[in-house]
Amino acid sequence: MKKISLIIMAILAFAGCSKLEVNKENILGTWVDDYSAYPYYAPEGGETYTFNADGTVDIHYYDVFAGDHDVQRTYTVGAVEGTSGMENDVLLLDPHMSDYSGDGFKIVKLTKTEMEWQRLGTTFQKGTVGSDFKHFRRK
């Protein structure tokens, strides 16, 4: 009986693990970078992303030393072929760039109020917060 209970618990635990399902509509709106959960990271500025339904994203960069500037880029959310097979839930900024100079991020968390990205091909480390790892809250 213990074996059966253990097997059932293992099956239920495995079934409860589901991958993040990212829908393009979930990303729409304005997101502000927020690193309050990472006290060891002290940015000198920040970024605000406004994702629009037409596939464009308006980005506002603010920097204490260099000043503010705005850019508009295109984006797509979906699956791409990665070095270890298909990567799902990927955000590509400027995916049309023929030289692949656009940015690619794995969306690792997306809720109504919070979003996290990890640059493709990198792993989370304290030193990469702000460049390879980004954390946002909805504005």
Q: Model-found features: residue ranges?
A:
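Sec-dependent bacterial lipoprotein signal peptides
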Residues: 1-17
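Residue-level recognition of alpha-helix boundary/capping or hinge positions
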Residues: 17, 108, 137-138
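N-terminal helix-cap/turn-to-beta initiation motif at the start of protein domains
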Residues: 17-32
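A short glycine-rich beta-turn/N-cap micro-motif
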Residues: 31, 53-57
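Contiguous, well-ordered beta-strand patches that form the walls/edges
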Residues: 36-43, 56-119
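His/acidic/aromatic-lined binding-pocket segments of jelly-roll/cupin-type domains
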Residues: 48-50
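Short, exposed beta-strand-loop hairpins at the edges of beta-sheets
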Residues: 114-130
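Short, low-complexity, Pro/Ser/Thr/Gly-rich segments in the mature regions of secreted, periplasmic
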Residues: 130-139
